[in-house]
Design a protein with these regions (language model features):
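Catalytic core of DAGKc-family lipid kinases
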Residues: 31, 40, 55, 78-197, ...
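Short glycine/serine/threonine-rich phosphate/pyrophosphate-binding segments
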Residues: 46, 68-73, 98-99, 124
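Short amphipathic alpha-helical segments
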Residues: 18-20, 74-77, 101-103, 148, ...
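Glycine-rich phosphate/pyrophosphate-binding beta-alpha loops
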Residues: 139, 143, 222-237, 302
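ATP/nucleoside-binding phosphotransfer catalytic cores, i.e., glycine-rich phosphate-binding loops
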Residues: 208-209, 215, 234, 240-246, ...
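ATP/NTP phosphate-donor binding region
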Residues: 1-64, 71
Length: 328
């Protein structure tokens, strides 16, 4: 039985996943020997295929797809208790490919294959939301509303511009949400404008039973293992995938014109952290409670929840990476 498995999302790469498949298959077979190819056709097919690969004794799993397909594979290997045992090789064929950049993998298939052939293995942190794993980021509010507005057909036609189109569509009806955020005080690491005056009683954060607590209204939030979302939007510029922390970005309620300007700063490369209405900190675990169920996008997977419990699993996954991930 082949010792490696290739899981392919045929709708990735503007529906060009199958076009890349012969070259990918030949290159991987030359380097790693015979392997079975599994084509996904529906939600969580990648998860089932990855779990089956672990049960079949595979020692490598390759993923040809985007961040959503990768998320399914991570969850499948975690369910099979094989996440720290079987390395994942990512061939980034999606629209955003945000996590591939953290692994220093090219979006050009031939170059990515050359990097994977080096078999440089790295340990990578994994985040969880309500027990389900994510590898790149989990975001709610405006972020997830945009994701819901951007379907596969729009991504196939417009590529990364789809997220801008979706954002313009969502802006008209978007509303902020009341939120209660709490985390252990000993794992609170402020990184931007969390100065003493913002942590004072009644001015933001407060201490309550050994926990840091914040009650506010949010336009959006992102809990990040990696730096980027939405095809290169630098939401968490200080995040690393191997530091044992989640980087958290909370965007407080503000006038809509100000919010539009802030989104432009995110797109421009991380200057949003200079806005005092942005809270940026690190945490190992985090609880969020909302006045109503909010849409949450976790590596492309959408759900609605009024309670979100996050934690990090340090070094829980193994990946094949490019030549230099020192800044990832």
């Amino acid at each position: 039985m082949p010792r490696a498995r290739l899981i392919v999302n045929p709708s990735s790469g503007k529906d060009r996943g199958p076009d890349y498949l012969p070259g990918i298959n030949e290159a991987l077979r030359t380097r790693f020997g015979m392997m079975e190819i599994v084509m996904t056709t529906g939600a969580r097919d990648g998860e089932a295929a990855a779990a089956q690969a672990a049960r079949d004794g595979c020692d490598r799993v390759f993923v040809a797809g985007g961040d959503g397909t990768l998320n399914e594979v991570v969850n499948g290997l975690m369910a099979a208790s094989a996440l720290d045992r079987i390395p994942i090789g990512l061939l980034p064929l999606g629209t955003g490919n945000d996590f591939a950049r953290m692994l220093c993998l090219s979006e050009e298939p031939g170059e990515a294959l050359a990097s994977l052939a080096l078999e440089r293995r790295v340990a990578v942190d994994v985040g969880t939301l309500n027990g389900r794993a994510f590898i790149n980021a989990s975001g709610g509010g405006f972020i997830s509303e945009v994701t819901e507005a951007v379907d596969d057909r729009l991504k196939s036609i417009a590529g990364r511009l789809a997220f801008l189109i979706g954002g313009a569509h969502v802006m008209r009806d978007h509303e902020s949400v009341a939120a209660r955020v709490s985390l252990p005080a000993d794992s609170f690491r402020p990184l931007s404008f969390e100065a003493e005056e913002r942590r004072a009683e009644g001015e933001g954060w407060r201490t309550e039973g050994g926990r840091m607590v914040l009650e506010t209204r949010l336009h959006m939030f992102a809990v990040c293992n990696a730096k980027q979302i939405g095809g290169g939007r630098l939401i968490a510029p200080h995040a690393r995938i191997d530091d044992g922390w989640l980087d958290v970005c909370l965007v407080d309620e503000m006038p809509m014109l100000d919010f539009i300007g802030l989104l432009a700063k995110v797109a421009a490369g991380g200057s949003h952290l200079g806005d005092e209405r942005v809270r940026y900190f690190r945490a190992r675990e985090l609880e969020m409670r909302f006045e109503r169920p909010v849409k949450v996008n976790t590596d492309g997977e959408l759900l609605e929840a009024a309670a979100c419990d996050y934690c990090v699993l340090p070094g829980a996954a193994r990946f094949l990476a490019g030549t230099d991930t020192s800044n990832s």
